[in-house]
From Swiss-Prot:
One of its GO terms (biological process) is SOS response. The gene is recA. HAMAP family: RecA. It is found in: Cytoplasm. Belongs to the RecA family. PANTHER family: MITOCHONDRIAL DNA REPAIR PROTEIN RECA HOMOLOG-RELATED, RECA. InterPro entries: AAA+_ATPase, DNA_recomb/repair_RecA, DNA_recomb/repair_RecA_CS, P-loop_NTPase, RecA-like_C, RecA-like_N, RecA_ATP-bd, RecA_C_sf. The lineage of its organism: Bacteria, Pseudomonadati, Pseudomonadota, Betaproteobacteria, Rhodocyclales. ATP binds at G66, P67, E68, S69, S70, G71, K72, T73. One of its GO terms (cellular component) is cytosol. Keywords: ATP-binding, Cytoplasm, DNA damage, DNA recombination, DNA repair, DNA-binding, Nucleotide-binding, SOS response. Can catalyze the hydrolysis of ATP in the presence of single-stranded DNA, the ATP-dependent uptake of single-stranded DNA by duplex DNA, and the ATP-dependent hybridization of homologous single-stranded DNAs. It interacts with LexA causing its activation and leading to its autocatalytic cleavage. It comes from Aromatoleum aromaticum (strain DSM 19018 / LMG 30748 / EbN1). The keyword Nucleotide-binding applies. This is Protein RecA.
Amino acid sequence: MDDNKAKALAAALSQIEKQFGKGSIMRMGDGTIERDIQTVSTGSLGLDIALGLGGLPRGRVVEIYGPESSGKTTLTLQVIAEMQKLGGTAAFIDAEHALDVGYAEKLGVNIQDLLISQPDTGEQALEIADMLVRSGGVEIVVIDSVAALTPKAEIEGEMGDQLPGLQARLMSQALRKLTANIKRTNTLVIFINQIRMKIGVMFGSPETTTGGNALKFYASVRLDIRRTGAIKKGDEVVGSETRCKVVKNKVAPPFKEAHFDILYGEGISREGEIIDLGVQHKIVDKSGAWYAYKGEKIGQGKDNSREFLRANPALAREIENKVRAQVGLNAMAVEAAPAGVAPVEP
C-alpha cells in the first residue's frame, strides 16, 4: 500500500475509533480478535462430537426445534446444568408457563440460582432477554418457546382477529437488537421452537418452524431433535431413543447426527452414550450381549453395563476420555477406578 493510501486509512481508522469507541474496528492480524470459540457441553457426548467443537458456542444464537415430547426442553435444561457447573449464571424465560421445576432439579439444574421469568407477552419476553444479555451478568438465556411469544396486539385483540406476520416481525426486530449484544457479552442464547405443517406442499418437507425466517438466518447452530423409539424395561416404557441432527452450523461442518437415550426422570443417559460410542470407536468390545473393556466384562446387556458404569464413574470417565481423544476433544479429569467390582449380570 502506498504512503498516501496508508495515511488516508490511518486517518479513517482514527476517526472511526474516536466516533464509535476503541475496538470498533480492528486488524485481524493484531491478535485482538478471539479466534477460539468458547463452548458449553450439551450434556450429551455424542452431540458434543457432532457439533464439532465439543458443545454449543457461546456468544451465538442457537435454535432447538422438534415435535412435541421430543426432548427439546430436556436438552436445554442439561445445557443449563452444564453451564452452572462451570460457574455460570442461567436465565430461563418460560413463555409457555410450563417449566417443571422438580424435573429440572433431577437433571442437575441448581434451582436456587436459576433466574426464571414467565412473561405475559412476546415483547415483554424478548425485552427481558435483551436486558439480561446487555447486563453481561448471565452466561446463558433460554427462551421456551418461540411459538409462545404472543405479540401484545394479539393478546389485546379479539379471538378471531387476523394479524398476519405479526410474530415474524417481532422476532426479526428482536434478533436485530440482540445479536450485537450477544456477541459483545459472550452470552449463549437458546430459542426452543415448535414445528408446524405447511398446507399444500407437494414436494419436499411440509414441516416448518414458527416465528418466520429471521431465526433461521441469525442462528449459528440449529438442532433438529426427534424421538425415534421407546426404551422399555419389561412392559414399562422408561425412556426415549432420540436422534439429534445438526441442521445448520456456522462454527463447524454441519449435517452430523447424534443418537442418545433420554431416561424419564434422569435426562440424557451419559453412561449409555459412553457404551455406544466406545463400541463404535472399538474401545469397548461387544460379544453377543456382553460388553467388555480391556478384557474385563462390564455387564450383560446395555442396561446392566450402564448400571456398572454408573457405579464406577472413574472407569466411565476413562472410556469417555479415550473416545474424546479419538475425536479430538479435550479430556475429562480421570480418577482411580475402585478395584474388585464385579460386572453386572441380569
